[in-house]
Every structure is written in C-alpha cells, then in structure tokens.
Amino acid sequence: MTDKEESNHSSEVGAVRSLQETPTWALATVCFFFIAVSICLERLINLLSTRLKKNRKTSLLEAVEKLKSVLMVLGFMSLMLNVTEGEVSKICIPIKYANRMLPCRKTIKSHNDVSEDDDDDDGDNHDNSFFHQCSSKGKTSLISEEGLTQLSYFFFVLACMHILCNLAILLLGMAKMRKWNSWEKETQTVEYLAANDPNRFRITRDTTFARRHLSSWTETSFQLWIKCFFRQFYNSVAKVDYLTLRHGFIFAHVSSNNAFNFQNYIQRSLHEDFKTVVGISPLMWLTVVIFMLLDVSGWRVYFYMSFVPLIIVLVIGTKLEMIVAKMAVTIKENNSVIRGTPLVESNDTHFWFSNPRFLLSILHYTLFLNTFEMAFIVWITWQFGINSCYHDNQGIIITRLVLAVTVQFLSSYITLPLYAIVTQMGSSYKRAILEEQLANVLRHWQGMVRDKKKTIQTPDTDNNSNNNNGDIDSGESPVQTEVASEFRFSGRQSPILQEIQIQEKTER
C-alpha cells in the first residue's frame, strides 16, 4: 500500500458518512430492525385491545386508547424535533441572554475554547456551520442540534416511564384487591349471615367496626387525623371496613340483595379510575415546561419538587381514612344500639367540596409529577452520566429516586385502592358498571333461550313454547325476574332492563 493510499484509508477510518456513502446492506439492516420492532409493538397493542374488547373490559380498553393518544403526542413531538432541528439551530440570540438561567454554569465555554474544539473536530461541520453563522454576528444559537436531539430522547424516556408507571398502578392495585375476594366469598357463608343477623341487637361501641375506629385518644379531630395518618401505612382497608362499606353500599344502591359481588364492582371501579389517571392533560404539559424553565443552577427546584407528590399522596390517604373513621363516629352519635351490621351513610359531604372526583383529579396530577420526576432522573443519567453537574450531590439524587419510588408504591398499592372503595360512600355510584353486570346476566339468559329454541322440533314442544310465551305476555320474563331481584336500584328500574322488555315485546 502506497503512502497516498494509506493516507486516504486513515482519513476514512471513523469518518462521518451520509446515507449516500453508507453501504446498502447496513441501511437495509437498520431499517428492517426498526420496522420489525414498530410492527411488533403495534400488533401487541392491537392484540391487547382485541382481548379487552372480547372480555368486555370497557374501561381498560378506553385506558389503552387514551394511552395510545398520549404516545402519539409524544411521537409527534419527537418527529417535529428531528425534522426542524436544523431550522431551530439557525435561530440566533445575543450571548448575554444565552448565559442567563443555565442549569450547569461550569460547562460554559468561551468562544476561543469552542473554536479550538471545532478545529480539532472535523466531523461536526454541519453543526459548526450554524455556530459560525451566529458567531459571525456576535450571537449564539438558541439551541443546538445536539440539544434538540437530547430533548427528543427525553420525550422517549418520558413515554417509556409513563407506560411503566401506569402498568405498576394497575398491577399493584389489582394485587391489593385480590385478598378482598376472600372477604367477598365469606359474605355468602352461613357463619357470616348468622353473625350479621338483621334481627340481632348490639351496642354500637361493641361492634368490631366501632372498636377499630373509636378509642379514648381519638376524641378530638387532631388526634383522629394523626391516627388515620399512620393507619394508611398498615392495614389501610381492614376486613371489617370492607364488610361494613359493602353493607352500606348495597343498602343504599342495590336494595337488600346480599348476593351482589361488591369486590367485582370495586375492581371495575378501579379500572374506571385507571382510565382517568392514564392521560396527560394540557395543564400537565404546561407543568413540564415550567419546571424546565426553573431548572436553574443553584435553585434545586427538582429537589423541592420531589417532596410535593409524597405530601399530596399522604394527605389524600389520610383524608380517605378520615372519611371511614368519621362514618364510625356518626354511627355512634346517631345510635347507641344497632340492629345487624353497622349501617354507614352514603353522602358526598364526606369529601372535599362535596366532590369525590376532586381527590382523583389531584391524585392524577400527582402521579404525573412523580412520573416526570423519575423520567427526568433516568434521562439526565443516560445523556450526561453520573459525573455531570446534575449529579453534583449524589445524596440529593438518591433521595429524589427513593421518594419517587415510594410515592409510586404508596399511590398504586394503598391510595388508589383505598380511593376506589371509599368513594363508593358518595351519594352517587358508577351506574355504567352495574349496568354492565346486568348486561352480562341478560346475555347469559339470551344464550340459554337460543339453545332451547334449537331443541324445539315437535308440535307438542311448539305448543308448550306458545304456552310459555303466553306466560311471558302476562307477566315478566325469567330474565326480568332474575335481573329485578339481582339489581334493584333503590326502586329505580335499569334502562337496560327497560330496553330488553321493549325488545321482547317487539320480537313477540
């Protein structure tokens, strides 16, 4: 190899190549990989949606659709950053403004240092051209192409963290409710019915529910708040709480039917709440912009912000425990002697602003702040390393990470399940969930009717069928009787039941 060939060969080693200088096999391999991964992810999401639709998980299906919308917004932002990074880099601003409100002051370089770096690095000519365009005017670029690329990475990390945090919310919440299933099954046993005989008189203070929430050192409101604050960390929903709240809900909304599956209703209610917390509102995006604006060196905004989600989650958990405790106090004040199970009163006045959904809105905002906090920590560690100015104080970073994980666990495993059951003590209830259970009963009955009609082949059976139809005309159908006994909405007839009655008359 001649000296000239060696010189050309050495100049090609490590050189930055455009696509027209890239081997086609390399280009095709990279394209195939990203296309395959994208198609697999799209198929998995569609498969999940189909599965949820087949199992009639309406709330979770809507949550998946909302999550897809969030990912679409994040994808559009990343795409716009990549497409417009060249034009944005051409925007020049005075240097005096560029040196204000910096997140890391020690990384600022002088013009001479930058020029020397540019001379040593011939691979960044495209980015350097924008720098020289601005420097020739005595200005600097608003944000470099490298900065825009790093920002697009942040949106990618935020999307991944948003998915992981919401998945943790759903899985931990359902794990918390799994043990409630055994309590629900216990309500159908003879022992439970005997222990909660409606004809049995008991002193209110001697009931298990009252003994759990009432004591000598909870007579003042402050003492009760302190007790409820610590209670959320251990046994936040006791068995007696579940059974008492179940009895109050059934008495208020489902007549006196003890066969109602309250645990299944609460689980579907959690799915409804999950559908709410999975989204990202414009106010939340505005919060992201504000925190990026205030991320100035020495202000430690993110450190102080990391305590906000923890405080809010603890306050909401304490408030929910207080609602249950005040129900026990109300029962004691109204009745010294009760019959059967203590009856809690369903009323929106238990909640702030008489609005149970207000707590969920605050919790939704808090969960997003926590997700943003974890995404930011992962992003700065990935992009700038552990030796960057963001990690000057390792203790602060560790504290922020521990607080974020703690908030995620508390809100997912304790606060949201507690909210799902306590908010059923409001004046209203999620009628759509009850209607969905009712619809399942109707579908089961309709399937039985179709199977029975297929077996009718003789005139005798046809006559019997006509006689049965006559019975239906003169009264209620079997499904109407079953549904009416299963779901009696405090004397109000279900719209689905009314629709089925009209449909049956039309078919006949």
From Swiss-Prot:
Transmembrane segment boundaries: 22-42, 69-89, 154-174, 276-296, 305-325, 358-378, 402-422
Topology of the protein relative to the lipid bilayer: Multi-pass membrane protein
Gene Ontology CC: membrane
Presence of keyword ATP-binding: no
Topological domains annotated Extracellular: 1-21, 90-153, 297-304, 379-401
Region (Calmodulin-binding): 436-457
One GO MF term: calmodulin binding
Domain of life: Eukaryota
First and last residue of the signal peptide: none
Keywords from the UniProt entry: Calmodulin-binding, Membrane, Pathogenesis-related protein, Phosphoprotein, Plant defense, Transmembrane, Transmembrane helix
Cytoplasmic side: 43-68, 175-275, 326-357, 423-508
Places the protein is found: Membrane
Pfam families for the chain: Mlo
Region (Disordered): 453-492
GO biological process: defense response
Modified residues (Phosphoserine): 494
Protein family (similarity comment): Belongs to the MLO family.
Record's comment describing the protein's domains: The C-terminus contains a calmodulin-binding domain, which binds calmodulin in a calcium-dependent fashion.
Known role: May be involved in modulation of pathogen defense and leaf cell death. Activity seems to be regulated by Ca(2+)-dependent calmodulin binding and seems not to require heterotrimeric G proteins.
Name of the protein: MLO-like protein 3
Protein encoded by which gene: MLO3
